[in-house]
């Protein structure tokens, strides 16, 4: 083994140089680490995952499966065959909104709203505690209501109004006639509801307050033209989708094709709730099921 006296002067110089290099490397490493820590501290606020504001569905178990609710501003398609509970989901969503102070636009093409009120009461939800305004009413409300109802009669009224406001066609000398179940009639009715609720600034189409929009069901608007479902869905979303509007859109499920009646709504929706039941003739009982097929910006339950 070599002793210190065996090391030559040249070797000592080399060792000193190596030590200096190591010290320099340590200094550089420390400087880089300090810079990294400073940068991390400086940019940490910008690297955080943005907080998603969530809207309660009105069903605690479903909220839990959705990390607290659906993202605010989402459009949720609710699909399923008759009798699976689609309308009941809508009632819970509306009720949660009323309790939270959110105004509600409730479009119902499947039943009269008075029947919705009766059914909701069976589940402990009394909509008549709140001010309800039917858009088919000829009288303007004295104060903004909590719920604006748009049923087939309201749609007929809006269709008549926009038909009368249309200019004459120069070739046919006739006006375009809008039907109650025309998608443009629905869009006009929704915007009229926003005005009645008092949530629009003058000249704006975007509500300044969060609104819950329920359409039960959209299938009625393309019942005679299911191939147009995607086009109509896009038209509705372009015209009515706003950051301050969270929507439930019901679509009937065709038993023959095992898919939604009209292709396209699920594609434009941010989330899809699907409901179904076992074949009652085979099972001899009613067994209903529910699954979250998709929900953007949400790590939702998968079963």
Where are these regions (language model features)?
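Phosphate-binding/switch region of NTP-binding enzymes
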Residues: 246, 250-303
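Loop/turn-to-beta-strand initiation segments
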Residues: 103, 146, 208-212, 242-250
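Conserved P-loop NTPase
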Residues: 20, 30-33, 37, 53, ...
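N-terminal pre-Walker A segment at the start of P-loop NTPase domains
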Residues: 41-61
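Phosphate-binding/switch loop-helix module in NTP-utilizing enzymes
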Residues: 150-241
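Conserved nucleotide-binding/hydrolysis micro-motifs of P-loop NTPases
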Residues: 110-114, 122, 153-158, 219-220, ...
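Walker A/P-loop NTP-binding active-site region of P-loop NTPases
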Residues: 65-147
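Interdomain "pre-motor" coupling segment immediately N-terminal to P-loop NTPase/helicase cores
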Residues: 2-40
